[in-house]
């Protein structure tokens, strides 16, 4: 059994759990690039004490490299919890991440998200680095 056996993928326009990656298709070498990853962009995902996105991880797989590099892990820890009960707390974190990277090789951005009920979800986007 492998962890990859449990990672789901779908079209983000049909499935609310899939992380949506927003990044340019082409960038210049060593240029600062903004990457935004959102869960529930097209179809809103619940954000309740009982059902929420716990975290998003972003990776980069350079072309021709046997390794994947972790860009960051982003946790969402507030989902309406309160000592008075569920879903009446003062704060809810939304499953959206913005990060900035500099790339010197073309490759693939990979986003992985975790729903506390429906498990792991993945998406990817190719990005080309030009001189």
UniProtKB/Swiss-Prot annotation:
Keywords: Electron transport, Iron, Metal-binding, Oxidoreductase, Transport. SUPFAM superfamilies: Superoxide reductase-like. GO terms for molecular function: iron ion binding; superoxide reductase activity. Its EC number is 1.15.1.2. It catalyses: reduced [rubredoxin] + superoxide + 2 H(+) = oxidized [rubredoxin] + H2O2. It comes from the Bacteria. Its cofactor is Fe cation. InterPro entries: Desulfoferrodoxin_Fe-bd_dom (IPR002742), Desulfoferrodoxin_Fe-bd_dom_sf (IPR036073), Desulfoferrodoxin_SOR (IPR051233). Pfam families: Desulfoferrodox. Fe cation binds at residues 15, 17, 45, 51, 115, 118. Belongs to the desulfoferrodoxin family. Uses electrons from reduced NADP, by way of rubredoxin and an oxidoreductase, to catalyze the reduction of superoxide to hydrogen peroxide. This is Putative superoxide reductase.
């Amino acid at each position: 059994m492998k962890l990859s056996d449990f990672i789901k993928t779908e079209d983000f326009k049909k499935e609310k759990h899939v992380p949506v990656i927003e990044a340019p298709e082409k960038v210049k070498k060593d240029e600062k690039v903004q990457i935004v990853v959102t869960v529930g962009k097209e179809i809103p995902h619940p954000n309740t004490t009982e059902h929420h996105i716990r975290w998003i991880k972003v990776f980069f797989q350079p072309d021709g490299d046997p390794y994947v590099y972790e860009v960051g892990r982003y946790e969402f820890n507030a989902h309406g919890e309160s000592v008075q009960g569920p879903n009446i707390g003062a704060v809810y974190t939304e499953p959206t991440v913005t990060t900035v990277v500099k790339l010197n090789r073309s490759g693939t951005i990979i986003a992985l998200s975790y729903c506390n009920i429906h498990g792991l979800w993945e998406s990817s986007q190719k990005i080309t680095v030009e001189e």
